[in-house]
A protein has these predicted regions:
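Short, small-residue-biased leader/transition segments that mark boundaries at the very start
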Residues: 1-8
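Extended hydrophobic
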Residues: 15-23
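Short alpha-helical scaffolding segments that buttress acidic/His motifs in well-ordered protein cores
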Residues: 18-19, 39-40, 56, 69-76, ...
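Conserved helicase/translocase motor-coupling segment
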Residues: 22-58
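Short helix-adjacent coil turns
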Residues: 44-51, 60-63, 102-105, 189
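Short, charge-rich amphipathic alpha-helical segments embedded
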Residues: 58-74, 81-82
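Alpha-helical, coiled-coil/dimerization segments enriched in small aliphatic residues
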Residues: 79-222
Length: 222
């Protein structure tokens, strides 16, 4: 309708005016800029779509999709992560759309992604897992077991990793002997998706892993 069209045109005009005003108002006020980015990320982490929209609205005024994209993608994978991987992928897609259309229309796909992240369950299990592995490496860097190496030396055929026995792969020990029992990944039970991952993880932990590849390779095919 004509009325709806007029409303839409006014919305576009308002967004353009906000961008124009902002380029002067916030010109290179770096402290305010990074404080606003921080407010956005903390609002997403704290599941507050209203706070997130407020800080996003302020950031629109900088007309800087790239910096905004970096911060929101970090937030998606750092704070939502395995609790809702699809939301992370939708965030990537939203910013692809945003770059295609540019501001002021870019505000719509980005707002959708931010609200999605705000109201998603949260999990920092991936970040915690890689940080635990990095901490272990800082203490001692260990080589991969011989049977995992690209060209294993001094192993009989039956002692080598068997590419033709996929049913055995989850029984193999992949960590070096010195840290064989380390568990870097600890599931967060905040979503059905990660609960399903955790259930499979428990099943694998229950049957354990072995570095005796020769014995494993001699087990009968199921």
């Amino acid at each position: 309708s004509s009325a709806a069209s007029d409303v839409y045109k006014r919305q576009i005009e308002d967004a353009k005016n906000a961008l124009t005003q902002a380029n002067g108002q916030f010109d290179k006020d770096e402290d305010q800029y990074y404080d606003t980015l921080s407010g956005l990320q903390k609002s997403i982490r704290g599941s507050d779509p209203n706070g997130a929209m407020y800080y996003f609205a302020k950031l629109i005024e900088y007309n800087d999709i790239e910096s905004l994209e970096r911060r929101v993608l970090v937030c998606a994978y750092e704070d939502v992560g395995l609790a809702n991987p699809n939301a992370c992928m939708r965030t990537v897609a939203a910013f692809q759309a945003a770059r295609t259309v540019g501001f002021p229309e870019a505000r719509i796909p980005i707002a959708s992604a931010i609200i999605d992240l705000c109201l998603s369950p949260k999990s920092k299990s991936s970040e915690a897992a890689i940080d635990a592995a990095l901490a272990s490496l800082r203490q001692q860097s260990l080589p991969a077991p011989e049977y995992l190496r690209l060209t294993p030396v001094g192993l009989e055929e039956g002692e080598k990793y068997n590419y033709d026995r996929p049913e055995l792969w989850e029984y193999i020990q992949y960590l070096p002997d010195q840290i064989a029992n380390n568990q870097f990944y600890v599931p967060w039970m905040t979503s059905q998706y990660e609960k399903a991952l955790a259930e499979n993880y428990r099943r694998i932990l229950k049957h354990g892993r072995t570095s005796n590849i020769k014995k494993l390779n001699h087990t009968k095919k199921s």
